[in-house]
């Protein structure tokens, strides 16, 4: 990390863990395992060392947002409707965004006991495979142009103005938008938005998704580690698809284990790595906080915007 992070405070794991008064984490091992992604690694110690201090920090930002909103209402001499505190979570494919997002949802719900906490992913705003195919963009799935960004920005504007909204649902099992299915997002107190593209907007250079965020997190790691995690996840998904002909990953079983992993390695190199280096990683300095991972998904450093 070079001059890109001149505006960040670098904090070691050891220092970070002491920024929160030691207490019992509000979940047990079974609950933690139930929210953990396929090949992610996270422990109760990680919750105590990393995520409880993070929740304390989010409390500070939440209080600041409430104070600012109240002061604005006085200045403008009008009531401002309740708006959700929006948290963006970004990072590469297979870096552990889903685990972090689900853990944040659980911890926030148990810290702010009278608050509602919703979680959504930007996958639902991918164009359906049929649309991508008609535009010869299937091999660009996950790249900025494969998302309906205008629809996503409209959704954020609706939510930020205190109104409920309906969003499409994406399934990793069928690798496509689920037809005739949607998720209703009411007006929560907290909304966590997870996606590789949450700091990007290729269609409107004047407006970024991050303009709607009250707090944002980027999960960072060396690309060699992420490649290994991606291949581990692919192998696990293959195994889970063995008895399910409808599962998207079932089709790769005919390649054999080595052939399937060679295919996954090519997908990583030709698509996911290119997307990471060209579009995802360059946006990380837009985050308020960067969680840096090393081997085995261990968070060793935290970068907090000054």
Swiss-Prot record:
<feature type="binding site">
    <location>
        <begin position="91"/>
        <end position="98"/>
    </location>
    <ligand>
        <name>ATP</name>
    </ligand>
</feature>
<dbReference type="GO" id="GO:0005737">
    <property type="term" value="C:cytoplasm"/>
</dbReference>
<keyword id="KW-0418">Kinase</keyword>
<dbReference type="InterPro" id="IPR006083">
    <property type="entry name" value="PRK/URK"/>
</dbReference>
<dbReference type="GO" id="GO:0004594">
    <property type="term" value="F:pantothenate kinase activity"/>
</dbReference>
<keyword id="KW-0808">Transferase</keyword>
<keyword id="KW-0547">Nucleotide-binding</keyword>
<dbReference type="GO" id="GO:0005524">
    <property type="term" value="F:ATP binding"/>
</dbReference>
<dbReference type="GO" id="GO:0015937">
    <property type="term" value="P:coenzyme A biosynthetic process"/>
</dbReference>
<keyword id="KW-0173">Coenzyme A biosynthesis</keyword>
<keyword id="KW-0963">Cytoplasm</keyword>
<dbReference type="InterPro" id="IPR004566">
    <property type="entry name" value="PanK"/>
</dbReference>
<dbReference type="Pfam" id="PF00485">
    <property type="entry name" value="PRK"/>
</dbReference>
<protein>
    <recommendedName>
        <fullName>Pantothenate kinase</fullName>
        <ecNumber>2.7.1.33</ecNumber>
    </recommendedName>
</protein>
<dbReference type="InterPro" id="IPR027417">
    <property type="entry name" value="P-loop_NTPase"/>
</dbReference>
<keyword id="KW-0067">ATP-binding</keyword>
<comment type="similarity">
    <text>Belongs to the prokaryotic pantothenate kinase family.</text>
</comment>
<comment type="pathway">
    <text>Cofactor biosynthesis; coenzyme A biosynthesis; CoA from (R)-pantothenate: step 1/5.</text>
</comment>
